[in-house]
């Protein structure tokens, strides 16, 4: 092979590898977003320790409703959305939001 052809082939191969790597990385992000975040749930947590609460309805990413509480220490815990205490916590937060 002539040197210009070899350089062109090398450049094309490098470009192809970069595109393949970029495509794989992008696919990995999508795949990780399309699954449930809560593998284990807690039936209760002290209301005073909750900094914020996120409720994610069922969708293509996960068949269950997910309730994720961020505690004042920064730790995130998954709560059981069917637990009576968790439902009371959600109602308290909703009522607190309506009062403001």
From Swiss-Prot:
SMART domains per UniProt: SCY
Keywords: Chemotaxis, Cytokine, Disulfide bond, Inflammatory response, Secreted, Signal
UniProt superkingdom: Eukaryota
Segments passing through the bilayer: none
Signal sequence annotation: 1-27
Compartments (UniProt record): Secreted
InterPro entries xref list: Chemokine_b/g/d, Chemokine_CXC, Chemokine_CXC_CS, Chemokine_IL8-like_dom, CXC_Chemokine_domain, Interleukin_8-like_sf
GO CC annotation, single: extracellular space
Keyword field contains Signal: yes
Molecular-function annotations in GO: chemokine activity
A Pfam family this chain is assigned to: IL8
Disulfide links within the chain: 36-62, 38-78
GO terms under biological process: cellular response to interleukin-1; cellular response to lipopolysaccharide; immune response; inflammatory response; neutrophil chemotaxis; positive regulation of cytosolic calcium ion concentration; response to amphetamine; response to estradiol
Protein purpose: Chemotactic for human polymorphonuclear leukocytes but does not induce chemokinesis or an oxidative burst.
Family: Belongs to the intercrine alpha (chemokine CxC) family.
Assembly notes: Homotetramer.
Descriptive protein name: C-X-C motif chemokine 2
Species: Mus musculus
């Amino acid at each position: 092979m002539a040197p210009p052809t070899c350089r062109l082939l090398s450049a094309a191969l490098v470009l192809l590898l970069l595109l393949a790597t970029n495509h794989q990385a992008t696919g990995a992000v999508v795949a990780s977003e399309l699954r449930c975040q809560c593998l284990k749930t807690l039936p209760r947590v002290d209301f005073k320790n909750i900094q914020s609460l996120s409720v994610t309805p069922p969708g293509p990413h996960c068949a269950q409703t997910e309730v994720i509480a961020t505690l004042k220490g920064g730790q995130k815990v998954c709560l059981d959305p069917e637990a009576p205490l968790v439902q009371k916590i959600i109602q308290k937060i909703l009522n607190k939001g309506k009062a403001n």
